[in-house]
């Protein structure tokens, strides 16, 4: 060291450390800072501070870095104001984080898009044409040491990471990205339908419902190998995509005599199925092969760039199909192309997800003398790890099993990153590498982490990238681009969680480390560890569907910001779903649909600029019928079918998730009209408790409510003692859970129960309109009859409840509206599991609120609470009363988890508030507790039942109960009660 350059220890380092520590962001947990050295060069007028890695593990921008440098100079307590300060975090000069700009990041340069849905999402300011590779952590895999299939993580807090991350990616994140115009590829099965049908000309175990017609050009065999389902079970080395033939035809221009290939799968049952196509990519393949999908939704067309993606399964979407058979085309391929001299190729089609068909066996290290056999997983394919999907999808075994079939665990995590390069190889993103020529913009590995606290502390969000200390990707992009992607996504996640759920949410480090899924992809890549699945405080939020929606939206926004900034263009975020939806009769044959846009307080660009109206007639499928610029639509009705509607908000960034479903039915001028009000908007985690040393989820009382469905629930929690540690994945400690539902899909809130109620109302001869509870509460019309759907609505808090509660059964505005209508003579049918408990046994309400709630229930609806959790068998029956309309009814409502209807664990029991006005009309079968009451209040009549009407499993039973209710209203409408006394005399009401 020269006299002009010296390094200080002890006190100076401590002062600098103290200064840097003071600038750590709030709720950050990147690890402890450490100052290794402080060197001052007076000749160069430079201060160099070398710190440990943690100093570079947080988000750094020009302002924060300037503040850090300023604090260093202040800590030196000398005249160094004109000195340059350089701060190192490990090997990284923090200035280098700012030297990489977005204009140095190279995006794809391909002329033609990969997959183009005709009449699809219009998102010029979204992710239109971008290709994203993404996967949801681990999956069910074969462990040769134990000669069994198992999860890669422990069963804990009613889920397992291998399934848990899917509950973000499949129902939320993938659709959001697709709604923004992106094409998303996954190395795991994305269809939860356990039926799977393969149609292929090569036969074998495939259906052979494949047909060709030749027009100007004739079909012939291509010179390359293709798919054949020659083995029902795949073993080591098997690749179905080199076992068969590919068909080929020269392309013609649109309007010429076309040649057509059709695939007509015989599906075992009606339902939603994913459709995958396959083909070969040849030197002269068409960039715009035209596929048509015929489904219950109509005909949808796609242009597929066959120059990319040959020799694997290419996803086109999910579609609703009838149970179909030979001769009814489902997928069609025409040989039209805009490119002269191009060829079209055709190979197998896959419909549905199915069960795993890759068998594994112990190859090395087994017990001597045992002749190990191949073993299948026997699990749905969507639960399996990526390694097995890749084999089924024709990926070379050099990618999916670098261990040569010895170690599936390491193969799986190594294969996922290598798969990205296999997709991108040969494209502008990864030239000079053999692959599928698909220009992948970025990749995301979505994981959750381990780690636990004994209190209410959040573990929080960790993100990992790899910069190779300033290295570059194959296309010249600086690897620091991954840090920019990581920062964008992590910032959005943490900011949105703090703004909506938990202001103390921890932002952990942005690690620059050589994790395979962050290091291997030759495109900007992020490995996300969202939260700790082992920490109860994290999972109070993590099991909540609305939290999952928010996080998924944050990730989508982070990707959008990164790609838009890379491309130097403005971006627009897709809107949130609309609110306050209502359908009202305008005049004969005309109905007004109205709604309101939902403001995204975190994103100013997310307001809708137009709306898409979709209609479903009867029990058909939704189809687009209108595009409107204002928040209303006039539906013209000339029949007595049930017409259901949903609204999709849209802007230049894409489209929102659909709204709740409302419906109408017009039975003619003489029919009375029922207004159905959807007050069941709840989606939530299971009930939980925290009693210090014991805590956990109590789904025996309430499993929570999934959004549409849940694919992450494995079974109830069994270990509630906080001090029980993890010892093995088979002995997970605190939070350990059962496994009896881990292959099942669990039904949730479909937001489509107006239709279920409406079917029974229409069967009784009544017309109906419908409304969301919000719109209804603010309306001023005077309906004759109200049918209020409350399902499993109840007041809850998410996590610590910092931002208040939601989903109360009867908010004040709704109470006021119903009270006003009652005075005006509106009759009311109310059904729900918490119609009384939420107003009496509610720890989130003050005494004053409870008093007001109970007064409303007694005076307006005519009941008082007896008990919650009133039935477990799910059976109820009518009892004799002075209201003779209710007789001979027996009802079975859903009390078990299943894939078609949400479960009712805790139905309510209550009794008439006034025996002179009300009567018991229904009891639960196993204990004779009251399950329903009817009241004739003089001004209005009410019927209230303690379980949701829509969960009655038999349609005829639903029809019977609805007709009995409507007959009761009709017979008492004039104020003359058809009331039977104990001696069968009839009294008039005054």
For each predicted feature, which ranges?
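A glycine-rich, often tryptophan-bearing local segment used as a flexible ligand/cofactor-contacting loop or short
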Residues: 793-901, 918, 957, 961
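Helical hinge/lid and interdomain linker segments adjacent to catalytic or ligand-binding clefts
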Residues: 716-848
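Non-catalytic propeptide/linker segments at domain boundaries
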Residues: 50-150, 341, 346-375, 379, ...
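Pro/Thr/Ser/Gly-rich low-complexity, intrinsically disordered linker/stalk tracts
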Residues: 562-605, 654-672
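Beta-strand-rich modules
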Residues: 635-654
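Active-site-adjacent mobile loop/cap segments within catalytic or ligand-binding domains
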Residues: 348-356, 427, 442-471, 501-567, ...
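Short beta-strand-plus-loop segments that form exposed binding edges in beta-rich domains
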Residues: 331-343
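A short beta-strand element within beta-rich, extracytoplasmic domains
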Residues: 259-283
